[in-house]
Amino acid sequence: MKVLALRHSVAQVYADTQIYTHDETKDDYENAFLISNLTTHNILYLNYSVKTLQILNKSGIAAVEIQKMDELFTLIRCNFTYDYIDDIVYLHDYSYYTNNEIRTDQHWVTKTNIEDYLLPGWKLMYVGYNGNDTRGHYNFSFKCQNAATDDDAIIEYIYSNELDFQNFILKKIKERMTTSLPIARLSNRVFRDKLFKTLVSDHSRVVNVGPRNESMFTFLDHPSIKQFSNGPYLVKDTIKLKQERWLGKRLSQFDIGQYKNMLNVLTTLYQYYDMYHEKPIIYMVGSAPSYWIHDVKQYSDLKFETWDPLDTPYSDLHHKELFYASDVTKLKDNSILYVDIRTDRENADWKTWRKIVEEQTANNLNIAYKYLSTGKAKVCCVKMTAMDLELPISAKLLHHPTTEIRSEFYLIMDIWDSKNTKRFIPKGVLYSYINNTITENVFIQQPFKLRTLRNEYVVALYALSNDFNNREDVVKLVNNQKNALITVRINNTFKDEPKVGFKDIYDWTFLPTDFETNESIITSYDGCLGMFGLSISLASKPTGNNHLFILSGTNKYFKLDQFANHMSISRRSHQIRFSESATSYSGYIFRDLSNNNFNLIGTNVENSVSGHVYNALIYYRYNYSFDLKRWIYLHSTNKASIEGGRYYEHAPIELIYACRSAREFAKLQDDLTVLRYSNEIENYINKVYSITYADDPNYFIGIKFKNIPYEYDVKVPHLTFGVLNISDSMVPDVVAILKKFKNELFRMDVTTSYTYMLSDEIYVANVSGVLSTYFKLYNAFYKEQITFGQSRMFIPHITLSFSNKRVVRIGSTRLNIDFIYLRKIKGDTVFDMTE
C-alpha cells in the first residue's frame, strides 16, 4: 500500500483509493495502525501527522507528503521505493513505453547499434545511475527519479539462446504489461546501495555471500567487503574436457564487446579486492573506446590509465599509442592490468590471420608475465586464443558473453599464479571450454563455508536456501551468527513442503519457528527496508518466491512498535471478512467457537483470543513483516520498548487460545504448514512463558451481584472470576493485586441475556463484559508467579441451579456488583471488598 499525505481533500476520484482523515482522539501510533489495515492500495491521508508518516515509513509502508497535484498524479499511478531519510522517491514506472522508448542506466548500451533492432519507431534512452538523469522531469517538493529501466531484459537477452532481439524485447514488454511488477528486483538495487553503505560505516568487517552480476556496481566503492561466490574455473579444471573444434556462434545481434570488456575488468577488480581490500589503479591496454568506464565512475572514484591508438574518452589518462612489452616498467604496484590487444583482420587470409593472432596471444601472455614478475599487489587479465599453450594450473579462465563465440577467452593471474606450475593445454581442449562455457558472474571468489564468523557482519541475500547447502548448517548459522542479515525462502506451501523448485534448482523452505534466535528480528523484505531508511509502496505477495529476512545484532531489536511491528496485521483479514466471508464478524466468531466459547454476544468487542497472533498465523503468507516470535519473547521477558499507541498486552493464555484457533482453521483449510506453524508457536509460548494452571484449585475469586434477573435455587449465585492454586502465605499477594484492580473491577459493564445448560444438571446464566479485565488480572497474577486460571478457556457464567431447567432469553440486563471476594474452596472467605 502507499500513503499519500494531503492537507486538503481532492475532487478527483481514483481507483482502488480510500480517504483517511487523521483522528485527533487517537495518538499517532493508533492512527498509523488504522491506516495500515485499510484494504485499498492507495490511501489519501488528510490532515496528516508527520509523526504518523514516520511510523508508517519505519514499518516499510511508503508514506509521502504531497504538496502539489502533479506529485499526487505521479505517485498514485505507479509504485515506488521511498528513501524517507533523504526524501527521495525512486519510481518504478514503465509509462515511458508510451513514448516509444526503452531505457537503460548503462552508458555503453547507448554506443551500440541496438536501436537497429528495437521495435519500429522506438528509441533508446540513457537515464543514469538508478534513473538519476530523470530528476529534471519532476519539479516536486521531494527528490524524484524513475529507476525503472529495461536493463534486466537486455542482459537476459545477452545470456539467452535467443538471437532475434526485437522479438525478445517485444515478448518481455508484453510480459511486463500482463504480470505483476517484480518490485523487489527493482527496489533491491536501491536497498543494496543503502544497506552496504550503512554496514560499512557501522562495522569494520563485512562479508557478503552469493553476489550476482546485478550487484557488480554496488560493491565498486566497497573494496573492504569480503565476497563469497561459487569459485572460479581454473586452468587445471580443463582436464575433464574432451577436445573440440572451432564452433563459431553469434550470441547477440548488436555489438556487446564493450559489455564483455567491462565484465572482464570488473572480475579482475573484484579478484584484487578479495586479495588486497583496497582500490587499485586500473591499467587497460587495447579495448578502446571503453564507454563503460562512464558507468563505473557513476559508482566509484576508480582511476583508469589506458593505451590505444583510438580514443578512450572516459579514461583519466589516455595514451593514444600502442603499448609494448617494454612499457610494462611504466606500470605501478597496487594495480590491475587488462590486456586486450588484437589488431584488425582487414583483408588477411585465414592462415595469415591465424598466425598473427597466435603471435599476439604469445605477446599478450609475455606482457602479463613481465607485469607480474616484479612489484607487489598486482592482478592481470589477458586476452587469449584457443591454441596449444602452457598455462599456470591455478590461473582463472573467463569467457564472458561477447557478440560472437569464436576462439577468444581470457585468463586472470596474480603474482603467485604466474609462478605456479604450468600445464600444457591443447587447442582442442580450449575450444571445448569456449564452446560450452559462459562465465555468468563477475564474482568468482571461493564458496562460503556454513560456519559462524566471530568478528564479521555476514550478509547472505538469497544465497543459502539452495538444497546443495545442508539445511541444519543453515539453521545453525542463523542461530549462532552474532551480526548478520540472512535471507531464507519462506515455506508458503500448503502441504508443508521441505523444499520447492525454483528455476532449475531446489530451495529449502523455512518458517520463523525453525530458528532459535533471541536477539534477531525475523521479518519480510518490506519490514527489513524500514530498518534501513527505506519504505515501499507494494507489499510482498505470496508468490512462492518469498524470503524471511533475519537480522541479528541489530540495535532495533527491542523497539517493538517501531520496526517489524504489527502494522497491517489485520489487513488480509479485513480483505477477506468484508468481501468474501459469511459475515464481517467471521474471524471473531470462529476464534470463540474453536475454543468452545459459545457466547457470541458482543464477540467483536469482547473476544477471548489474541487476534494479532491468530492473524499472524493463518495469514502469515500475506504479512510476515510482523515478527511474531520477537513480539512474544519481549513480552514474556517484560523487555518490550513501546513508544506509543493504544497498546494492549495480551495474557499468555490468550496467545495459547489463538494458536488453538489457528490450528482449527488450518485443519478446515487442509493447510499443513499453518498447522505446524501454530503448533510450534504454541510450543514457543509455553517455552518462554512459565505458564502454570490451576486445574486443581484451592481458592477462587467471586463476584456477587445485587440483582439476578433469573430464578435460582443455589444459596448465593455468583460469578467465579477465576480460580487459583496458591499457598496460604500467598493470600496477601493476591489481595494486594485485587485492591490494585478495585476501580477497574467495579467499572466493568457486566450484562446477562440468557440461561443455558453448561452440562447435565448445571444450569447457568451467561455473563458478558468481563473478559478484558479478566485477562489483565491474569497478567498481573502471572507476573507475580501466582497460578491463576485453568487450561480450559475461561467462560464467565453464574451457576443458578444444579438441576435441569428450561432455557430463558431476556433483553440484555446490567448486573450491578455488590462485592468481590476471595474464598478458599470448601472454606471461608479470606477477603472481600465493596465499591
From Swiss-Prot:
Interacts with VP1. Interacts with VP2. It holds the Pfam family Rotavirus_VP3. Multifunctional enzyme involved in mRNA capping. Catalyzes the formation of the 5' cap structure on the viral plus-strand transcripts. Specifically binds to GTP and displays guanylyltransferase and methyltransferase activities. Has affinity for ssRNA but not for dsRNA. Capping activity is non-specific and caps RNAs that initiate with either a G or an A residue. Together with VP1 polymerase, forms a VP1-VP3 complex positioned near the channels situated at each of the five-fold vertices of the core. The keyword Ubl conjugation does not apply. Residues 246-428 are annotated as: 2'-O-methyltransferase activity. Its EC number is 3.1.4.-, 2.7.7.50, 2.1.1.56. One of its GO terms (biological process) is symbiont-mediated suppression of host innate immune response. Residues 556-692 are annotated as: GTase/RTPase activity. This is Protein VP3. The keyword Nucleotide-binding applies. Belongs to the rotavirus VP3 family. The active site is at 718 (for 2'-5'-phosphodiesterase activity), 720 (for 2'-5'-phosphodiesterase activity), 797 (for 2'-5'-phosphodiesterase activity), 799 (for 2'-5'-phosphodiesterase activity). It catalyses: a 5'-end diphospho-ribonucleoside in mRNA + GTP + H(+) = a 5'-end (5'-triphosphoguanosine)-ribonucleoside in mRNA + diphosphate; a 5'-end (5'-triphosphoguanosine)-ribonucleoside in mRNA + S-adenosyl-L-methionine = a 5'-end (N(7)-methyl 5'-triphosphoguanosine)-ribonucleoside in mRNA + S-adenosyl-L-homocysteine; 5'-triphosphoadenylyl-(2'->5')-adenylyl-(2'->5')-adenosine + 2 H2O = 2 AMP + ATP + 2 H(+). Residues 693-835 are annotated as: 2'-5'-phosphodiesterase activity. It is found in: Virion. Contains a bipartite N7-methyltransferase domain, a 2'-O-methyltransferase domain and a GTase/RTPase domain. The C-terminus contains a phosphodiesterase domain that degrades the 5'-triphosphorylated, 2'-5' linked adenylate oligomers produced by the host cell in response to IFN stimulation. Residues 171-245, 429-555 are annotated as: N7-methyltransferase activity. It comes from Rotavirus A (strain RVA/Cow/United States/NCDV-Lincoln/1969/G6P6[1]) (RV-A). Keywords: GTP-binding, Host-virus interaction, Hydrolase, Inhibition of host innate immune response by virus, Methyltransferase, mRNA capping, mRNA processing, Multifunctional enzyme, Nucleotide-binding, Nucleotidyltransferase, RNA-binding, S-adenosyl-L-methionine, Transferase, Viral immunoevasion, Virion. InterPro entries: VP3_Rotav. GO terms for cellular component: viral nucleocapsid. One of its GO terms (molecular function) is RNA binding.
